């Protein structure tokens, strides 16, 4: 039987195979570049496209060793103290924290949103200083952000940490616009 010249199935299979091999080749080249850089690559940044903003932070290691950066002759991270485990993460955390203030659903509500990579409930502490009109955010007893508030008479009404994103809701404590209590 003579192959049908109109049959493109063999062309599709060869182009798919070629595309897969090209992707595999690119992956091997990137891994070789990381190997030349000492087996570790870490980058972070921000991409703004129109109304969208994307913050990214990645850490890639290849070769022998643990994901936390310790070698196999060091004690496992589960045997190290919590502060020792956090010290390596803290540099990354402080560099990649992003805090944003927004208006809430009601006119008297203010929402502070903080992206806190690698942070758990036990690590976070928030303090409201009404004299200074500021909200202080601490991670492991270190001040990582201080948000100056434009409203003198606010109180924290809700605080949640989900997927390493902290949301703090503040509301006015009085009905006046001037900030004076009646």
Swiss-Prot record:
Q: Where is this region: Disordered?
A: 1-21, 65-106
Among InterPro entries, the record links this protein to: GvpH
What organism, scientifically named, is this protein from?
Answer: Halobacterium salinarum (strain ATCC 700922 / JCM 11081 / NRC-1)
Biased composition regions of type Acidic residues, renumbered to the chain:
1-11
Pfam families annotated for this entry?
Answer: GvpH (PF05455)
| Record's subunit section | GvpF to GvpM interact with each other in vitro, and may form multi-subunit complex(es). Interacts with GvpC1. Might interact with GvpA1.
Q: Where in the cell is it found?
A: Cytoplasm; Gas vesicle
- Report the function annotation for this chain: Proteins GvpF to GvpM might be involved in nucleating gas vesicle formation. May be important for the stability of gas vesicles. Gas vesicles are hollow, gas filled proteinaceous nanostructures found in several microbial planktonic microorganisms. They allow positioning of halobacteria at the optimal depth for growth in the poorly aerated, shallow brine pools of their habitat. Expression of a 9.5 kb p-vac DNA fragment containing 2 divergently transcribed regions (gvpD-gvpE-gvpF-gvpG-gvpH-gvpI-gvpJ-gvpK-gvpL-gvpM and gvpA-gvpC-gvpN-gvpO) allows H.volcanii to produce gas vesicles. A similar region restores gas vesicle production in H.halobium without the p-vac locus, but it still has the c-vac locus.
Record's compositionally biased regions (Basic and acidic residues): 92-101
Additional comment? Encoded in a 14-gene plasmid locus called p-vac which produces predominantly short, spindle-shaped gas vesicles during all stages of growth.
What's a GO cellular component annotated to this UniProt protein? cytoplasm
The record's similarity note reads: Belongs to the gas vesicle GvpH family.
Q: Does the keyword Cytoplasm apply?
A: yes
Q: Where is the composition biased (Low complexity)?
A: 12-21
Gene disruption phenotype: A single deletion produces very low levels of gas vesicles, in situ. Deletion of gvpG1-gvpH1-gvpI1 prevents gas vesicle formation, cells still express gvpA1, in H.volcanii. A single deletion produces gas vesicles throughout growth, in H.volcanii.
**What is its induction behaviour?**
Part of a gvpF1-gvpG1-gvpH1-gvpI1-gvpJ1-gvpK1-gvpL1-gvpM1 operon, maximally expressed in early to mid log phase. Gas vesicles appear earlier when grown in static culture, possibly due to O(2)-limitation.
The protein depicted here goes by the name Gas vesicle protein H1
